């Protein structure tokens, strides 16, 4: 009987040690979900994300103060408006006179400035105005205007991480098939070959 008691005590001690070992294993700091270090790290990430969101909100509010048009939240509509706007923009520049008068040059300059300020997407408008400030509108000829427009479009493409457009074909690509008053088509054929 003494042996049974000793054996029973040994089993109880082993079981108790096993339970204590399992408890220690599952409640250790390295494995615990409630580990202060992990909570601190997670809260640090949340703080960084929160700060970034606040900074973005502040940036958007500042943009809204500086633009006429409101922000455009619908990305699908923003892309559709963008495609249509670029088509109009490039076609307009490709139709500009070869040798514009000072009045025509001023009108194009004014129009592009208003086009940028009144663009229906507030954030896009803000960036477009900043680009025009950095890269002023070129109005000396059709080629200068079209190449400037292509350069500006490529700056937007860079910002949006899109492919860069080959500006060498801009006048051909936006030749609307229209004719001058003398019946000649407006296209790259009318332009002298541009070197450089």
From Swiss-Prot:
Record topological domains on the Cytoplasmic side: 1-12
Swiss-Prot/TrEMBL catalytic activity: 2 R'C(R)SH + O2 = R'C(R)S-S(R)CR' + H2O2
Cysteines engaged in disulfide bonds, as pairs: 121-124, 150-167, 176-178
Keyword Transmembrane helix carried by entry: yes
Biological processes per GO annotation: regulation of protein folding in endoplasmic reticulum
Record key words, sorted: Disulfide bond, Endoplasmic reticulum, FAD, Flavoprotein, Membrane, Oxidoreductase, Signal-anchor, Transmembrane, Transmembrane helix
Protein's UniProt name: FAD-linked sulfhydryl oxidase ERV2
Originating gene: ERV2
């Amino acid at each position: 009987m003494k042996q049974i008691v000793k054996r029973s005590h040994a089993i109880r001690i082993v079981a108790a040690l096993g339970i204590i070992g399992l408890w220690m294993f599952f409640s250790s700091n390295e494995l615990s979900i409630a580990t202060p270090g992990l909570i601190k790290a997670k809260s640090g990430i949340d703080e960084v994300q929160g700060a970034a969101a606040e900074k973005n909100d502040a940036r958007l509010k500042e943009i809204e103060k500086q633009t006429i048009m409101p922000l455009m939240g619908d990305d699908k509509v923003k892309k559709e408006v963008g495609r249509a706007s670029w088509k109009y923009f490039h076609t307009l520049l490709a139709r500009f006179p070869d040798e514009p008068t000072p009045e025509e040059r001023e009108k194009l300059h004014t129009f592009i400035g208003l086009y940028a300020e009144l663009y229906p997407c507030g954030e896009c408008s803000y960036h477009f105005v900043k680009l025009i400030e950095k890269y002023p509108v070129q109005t000396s000829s059709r080629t200068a205007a079209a190449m400037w427009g292509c350069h500006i479009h490529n700056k937007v493409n860079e910002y949006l991480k899109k492919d860069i457009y080959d500006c060498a074909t801009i006048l051909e690509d936006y030749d609307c098939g229209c004719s001058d008053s003398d019946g000649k088509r407006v296209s790259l054929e009318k332009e002298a070959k541009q070197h450089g």
